[in-house]
From Swiss-Prot:
NCBIfam families: PRK14140.1, PRK14160.1
Protein family according to the UniProt entry: Belongs to the GrpE family.
A GO molecular function held by the record: protein homodimerization activity
Protein's UniProt name: Protein GrpE
Subunit structure: Homodimer.
Covalent S-S links between cysteines: none
Region (Disordered): 15-47
Organism: Clostridium tetani (strain Massachusetts / E88)
Name of the coding gene: grpE
Amino acid sequence: MKWRHDYMAEKKVEDLEMDLNEEELEESEVNEDKEFEELDKSEEENEVEELISTLKDENEKLNNEMEALKDRLLRTTGEYDNYRKRTDREKEGLYASACEDVLKEILPVLDNLERAILAKGDIEDLKKGVDMTLKQFKDSFKNLGVEEISTENGFDPNLHDAVMHVEDSQYGEKEVVEVFLKGYKKGDKIIRHSMVKVAN
């Protein structure tokens, strides 16, 4: 019996050792799992920190680019405003200069008309004065680059306004029969179309 008792005791010791080994093994596995979890957490934390750092750098870079673009936009807007103001002043100056040039040409004609009204004399003297004033007007127009629109080459809808049409065998088709109001142009720009009567 002793033998059996020793066997049982030995078996119990083996079972206890086995239980202890299993517990140690489980504890070791749990510790390893904890270490792996800590390693995983540590690696994840490092990755997250790197990602946060990268995103912060990119955000700072984008903010710098945005500030540079804002500054560029403000400068461009300011330059455009200055350009617009400068061109407005130049236009006003050109307009004033053009008006001044026209007035300088026309004022002497006005002076002569006033003198003609004040002059004492007969009809022939008055007619001679009006003819001279008319010549002076035409010279002023010539100096300003303004010329009368010709009707010698026939009717041209780009230059003439046909206010009347006539059937007359003495005139060719589209020939200007009569000028009611002379037209004028400066270069290629029409100031006023000639008002004419045209043959059909």
